[in-house]
Curated annotation (Swiss-Prot):
<dbReference type="InterPro" id="IPR036876">
    <property type="entry name" value="UVR_dom_sf"/>
</dbReference>
<dbReference type="InterPro" id="IPR035901">
    <property type="entry name" value="GIY-YIG_endonuc_sf"/>
</dbReference>
<keyword id="KW-0267">Excision nuclease</keyword>
<dbReference type="InterPro" id="IPR000305">
    <property type="entry name" value="GIY-YIG_endonuc"/>
</dbReference>
<keyword id="KW-0963">Cytoplasm</keyword>
<dbReference type="Pfam" id="PF08459">
    <property type="entry name" value="UvrC_RNaseH_dom"/>
</dbReference>
<dbReference type="InterPro" id="IPR001943">
    <property type="entry name" value="UVR_dom"/>
</dbReference>
<keyword id="KW-0742">SOS response</keyword>
<dbReference type="GO" id="GO:0003677">
    <property type="term" value="F:DNA binding"/>
</dbReference>
<comment type="subunit">
    <text>Interacts with UvrB in an incision complex.</text>
</comment>
<dbReference type="GO" id="GO:0005737">
    <property type="term" value="C:cytoplasm"/>
</dbReference>
<keyword id="KW-0234">DNA repair</keyword>
<dbReference type="InterPro" id="IPR010994">
    <property type="entry name" value="RuvA_2-like"/>
</dbReference>
<comment type="function">
    <text>The UvrABC repair system catalyzes the recognition and processing of DNA lesions. UvrC both incises the 5' and 3' sides of the lesion. The N-terminal half is responsible for the 3' incision and the C-terminal half is responsible for the 5' incision.</text>
</comment>
<protein>
    <recommendedName>
        <fullName>UvrABC system protein C</fullName>
    </recommendedName>
</protein>
<comment type="similarity">
    <text>Belongs to the UvrC family.</text>
</comment>
<dbReference type="Pfam" id="PF14520">
    <property type="entry name" value="HHH_5"/>
</dbReference>
Amino acid sequence: MPEILNHILILEKIKNLGISPGCYLWKSRKGEVLYIGKAKNLDKRVRNYLKENHPDIKTRALQKEIFDLDWIATGTEKEALILEATLIKKHNPRFNVRFKDDKKYPYICVSLSESFPMVYITRKLKDNGDRYFGPYSDVKSTRETLDIILRIFPVRKTRQVLPLPKPRRPCLNFDMGRCLGPCQGNIPVEDYKIVIDQVIQFLEGKKESLVGDLSIKMSASSNRMDFEKAARYRDMLQRIQNFREKQTVVSAEGGDEDVIGFARKKDEGQVILLEVRGGRLETKKSFPIQGVLDAEDSEILGAFFRDYYLNAALVPPLIFVPADIQEETAAVMDVLQEKTGFRPKLKSPRGGDKRSLLKIAEKNAELGLTERLLATHYRDQTASLKEIQEMFSLEHPPHIIECYDISHFQGSEPVASGVMFVEGKPFKQGYRKYNIRGYKGINDPGMIHEVISRRLQRIANEESVFPDLIVIDGGPTQLAKACEAAMEAGAERIPMIGLAKKREEIYFPGDNEPFIFDMNSSGMKLLRHLRDEAHRFGVSHHRSRRNKETMRSLIQNVPDIGLKRSKLLLRHFSGEKKIEDATKEELLAVPGIGENLAEKILKRIRKKE
């Protein structure tokens, strides 16, 4: 049994749980809320978490941290569901699937509590009779929708309590025909309400019926010789038509439906919701998610379904999802049926147009997740480069960093490697391998001098760009020789540092005393990555060169092995596979190597052993 089960506090609390529905809160030793869940039967659900060798990875990880338990009993499972969503938003537990920045999601409000309602963006929902539409995934898309509404419908834009005690002068919106002027007292409440009802129809996605309604009103106004009002309806119809022409038709039979796509990578996820209203794709909403590493797809989608639709102003009768989440959404469906008067249908289409639409949502989710991860990585790398700039007092963040490492085996076959990072990421085209020419034996400082000289000379000859920082894998002696090479090449202005492996010590030119920076800082992590990549690249090159030299020494005295066959053998066994481990069959696979020659090579290998 996990140690946590022996804790008297939890054992005693479990005895008092009872079989009522409610929410349970697992807490850490420090009182942090780790996980929040709901249950139809609290006692049964909580005991399930305390099983030894639990099959769920996420639950096993939770077991290691739980220290205390709290719970809130409710009258029904539906009440538990609503409470669960509220508690998760309040505590944001790290073991729950979490939607990023949940508080930011905006709504469009139609202030029906006022005599002359306004239409505006808000994040606060009040229980005062106002009508809310959303949530939208970001402020930009909300503003675009609001802008369309304010261009189509002549509703007021100014925030003031109406009617005013004294009519004010008409504003520019009134002069342009974009407002009916309720602040002047020019329009009765009943007539203004008709326009507000049309706004609500538009936001509900009932554009077909809205177009029909406006067409009837335009004809009626024209028949009454009320040409001003008829012109207003005509203009509204034209603007709606222009808006609809920009929308994609995805369903010939019309209808309202939501299509949910989902993508995940490691601990991050992305949900895309496509809103189809009247058969037209109206809105794409994007919701980033965290904490999905050990969660099943059904759990993640179930959590999204709960958090989104419990707060959604409009719920369509049909919702397409990429996985079966009937069980995870049963309680939510009960609440929605009570709230809307109908139970939405969940479907996971396997073919046809609906499957194609679901694939579009999933593809958008993948693209959105990739874009977000890249943006996060770019922000992290930018922060790392900024930190390195501050660490070494550079003029600007080091956009190009190069690192050099020496590899040899007791001085034999010495090679050097140079790797390049651009904007904090490996730039493979800038990687370089060097066979040391001027030194034999163990002389790392001299070899560094040679490599830096060759590199800087090549940059000068090619009129290429100098790096913003050079990192030498080594201590003060290697760094001093690198600086000497830079001085000789007239490139002494290039900043250089040494990074020693033992304690991740940083050396500056002319200073034998190391500096120790925070090992866990983003700047040091990037420098270690750079140094380790240079070491990996160098070791790989050195191993390859040693293998070739070993093969040369093995085959150079074999009779009948000329230059051409030697090259073929070297090329064939140039990787991890060494010639001394070769079988006769493997030797025969080399072009130009027959039975007799293979036997001679094997005899030479055995003689060496």
